Amino acid sequence: MRKLRVLFQGDSITDMGRDRGDIRNMGSGYPLFVASNFRAARPNFDIDFFDLGISGDRVRDLRARWQSDCLDLRPDVLSVLIGINDTWRRYDSGDPSDTEEFERVYRSLLEDARSENPSLKIIIMEPFVLHVSEERASWREDLDPRIQAVRRVAKDYADAFIPLDGLLNAAAVDTCPEQWAPDGVHPSFDGAALIARYWLEAFDKIL
């Protein structure tokens, strides 16, 4: 019997400098914290973790590589965090992503994954931005409707949903947003550890 297979998918927040030539490499972000903390707590649990996030990806980029980077791996647990680049490209490149199309593509990814493996467990994390500057705060116009789209998708597909935008911004109330994500998007080690904590709490409920 093969080990339980957990796949992390997403963008740079998931990628975090992983060695793409080594499928076992977990980068330096929350997937590494998840894998190391889980194995430390349960060293005899038969489980494999895979991080296949790619920096810069939007949901349509996930669509383009979904067969090779998700379906062919046949995960038992699929974790997805995507969406901030769909917002970011509007502001740095003048290349917006339609929210309805974003939701449609997101649903198609999960529909395909569930069709491939009806017993698949899905963990969805919503995209987030922390208000480290007025510029980042201005992204709310684009990001908030996208977060609502992710929540609708999660209601229909997720076995566990992690409302990261709310959780991380709540954490920033008692400290400062830069502690968790210096640029408002990419987590610090503290931020990655906090995301991993939320993830493991959600995972425990569906394991």
Residue ranges and their predicted role:
Residues 54:
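Conserved active-site regions of diverse hydrolases
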Residues 2, 33-48, 57, 61-207:
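Alpha-helical cap/lid subdomain in secreted, periplasmic
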Residues 2-25:
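Short glycine-rich His-centered loop
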Residues 26, 30-34:
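Short N-terminal amphipathic alpha-helix/helix-capping patch enriched in small hydrophobics
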